[in-house]
């Protein structure tokens, strides 16, 4: 409940020191100063009586949070302080707004970008997310400044920053050619990354599974990562192979971090394919060993056993070189077509389905949405075709040449999801975007990733405790990107805050019915303004563009 107009009911009993002082180096200590010098101020808002979790991973404490303008200006007992508005948080948790370090809020095509089509970002706000970082998987806008200016001109409901994509940079210089760059081309790509970092990118992302990034060798990525490192950026990667080549791909990521001298992050960390189930233990051990050797290596994940991407991921890399006409000619050539089909069968068997064609579900075929929601098995049955991997490969090729589709792939094991989640070097990210209900059948992570962690993995299963989960969704990603004034509840930090019911917060989106908003988040403030009030979306869009060049402090 929110009450306003009680400007005389509080008299300030705090000062500069009445707050939680966060120890950045330790990342997990918080303290209060109980006898500060007095300093009078009137607050715009006080969040009163909630269990406050500062984002460090420390236990919560019943405190009040005072806000003036866009900043937190006091934390403590503010029961006598003057304020224009009181937000009653008794019985609720008060936490930093969550930061999605892997977001598809903006896509390369503006017309399909949720942030521009649905700038209020309701599906994020209802999970407690106040900041999204775009440009993942090697794909971003270029120039970066063009994107950030466009976002600034679109009042948005959440904060937004971006990485610069390796695939984007490579395509700018080399198109979709499957070869190594010349010295001049490599220099041009390095220059593009340098410019993007100067324009505010937070680092370099790669998608070495996708075209044209898959055509790059490790040395190329190291060279571009050095340009990001020069501006205190990070390297975040969709691994070259998340299936049978998982461990070698993590070794490559570590080598990039070592060679370029920058922090690295394995994004949407998973072990994909039945033959790889359980391999997360070895994957995490590789990251632990890297950290022990002084290489800063972390990961993020979404809390599901299914992934989602375009069906072109089923094709051999070599078959996707060049423009659409070149790819179509390749598929029309009998010899090359046979090789392509064999490659699709191998990928379906070894990584994406085993021999179970219900594991692949079509999410969006924009050219024929009657196909949305069908499994590959169901697709074959619709056309009265044999339910075999070979028939499925033929249909996949037909889907791609007809216009392409995105799909959901049920390829992971719950044991790996939980093991990766527990690891202290793992933070939470959605790999989702901004949606409103529509004809697509997207991955439920778009609507539920962060709420699912709290509802399922904290409350129901006990995989994480509540303070640790909050840390993995707020301060941990903030620190990863050098944001010393977001992702935490501290005096001087921006007032990006979620107030939620820890006993009710839960995801409602399912794979069968994904367009369902999460529940249990009561209030959300973005830069001190109410974006969600008493569970209802406001018309206020107080989100801001975040640039790495505006960081107050570098990464700890």
PLM region spans:
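Bacterial N-terminal signal peptides
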Residues: 9-23
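Acidic, glycine-enriched loop/beta-strand segments at the rims
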Residues: 36-37, 52-64, 404-417, 461-470, ...
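Histidine-rich, glycine-flanked metal-binding segment
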Residues: 38-46, 52-97
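C-terminal cap of metal-dependent C-N hydrolases
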Residues: 418-425, 430-431, 498-544
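Divalent metal-coordination and catalytic microenvironments
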Residues: 50, 65, 70, 91, ...
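Active-site neighborhoods of metal-dependent hydrolases
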Residues: 163-164, 172-183, 187-211, 225, ...
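Divalent-metal coordination cores built from histidine and acidic residues
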Residues: 89-94, 98-206, 225-226, 291, ...
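Divalent metal-binding pocket/active-site signature
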Residues: 195-253
